[in-house]
Amino acid sequence: VFGSKGKEAAIQEISQLCKRDCFAPVSIKDMTRKERSKAKEALMFLTEKKDRSIKGRMVYNSKPTREWLSREDVASPTAATESVLLTAAIDAMEGRDVMTSDIPNAFIQAEMPQADDGHEKVIMKITGPLVELLIDINPHLYGPMVVFEKGRRVIYVWVLKAIYGMLIAALLWYKKFKLKLEGVGFQFNPYDPYVANRMVKNNIQTIIFHVDDIKSSHLDEKVNNEFEKWLNMEFGKHGSVTTRRGKVHDYLGMIIDYNNEGEVKIDMTKYVGDMLQDFPIKFKEGQVATSPASKKIFTGGVRKLIDKTRRETFDTF
């Protein structure tokens, strides 16, 4: 679809996965029949960003992980809306310096559970054009591992890092990030596992985060400067941590505005507008309802299930 730009984006994505040792090739001779049957194909998604550049993302089919992970393991904590709003209010009231940050490729910086700890190996099957890209990147490592299945070239790899698409990926990253933060003195809030505080220069530094999106605040901007350096030292080896300073921050779909002293304004107009623009079903003028709960919602017996496309739209929006 995206031509040479798409290929370049795919190469860049696979290259950075290889640099981070996200997977290792597995000989078909060393695999059990069960491992081979459970291996799912890797998918490469290409999307066009706002700046017209193409972003590639290799995604793992999450179905195999459902079988050996508990419900608790696949449910990653999420910052409460109240926590986001209350910490923003405290930042404004105390006149704190605020910094928002985004850690690149967070999931793949977290290691998968080791097979010798009672967990099964997670095997991924790479097929099609992705095989050619892997061989181009490292022919000596991946070339001998190619096998043919139904006329297709296939490479099996053992997944070593939490790749996007895995149900456990967000939780593995959370556990790693939490451990790192506790190592530098942060104490986590007992009511919200995505909020943490520590004392620095006789004042509180507060961080709140949702996966890899972080907001840090402290009275002294130098504390945030040092925290930014620490984030890059720990998680920016293969791509710098992006940060935003100043009075206005685009964070978790909200525009957080501290321009008025002692006040904070939360604006989600842009987020709602983008959501409406991206919504695939277009309504005609006047085709509205005051409520989705019509008078017939509980009548008429068993209704027909909506089709797959509409179900996915409902889940997304």
Each language-model region and where it sits:
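Long, low-complexity, charge-biased intrinsically disordered regions
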Residues: 1-317
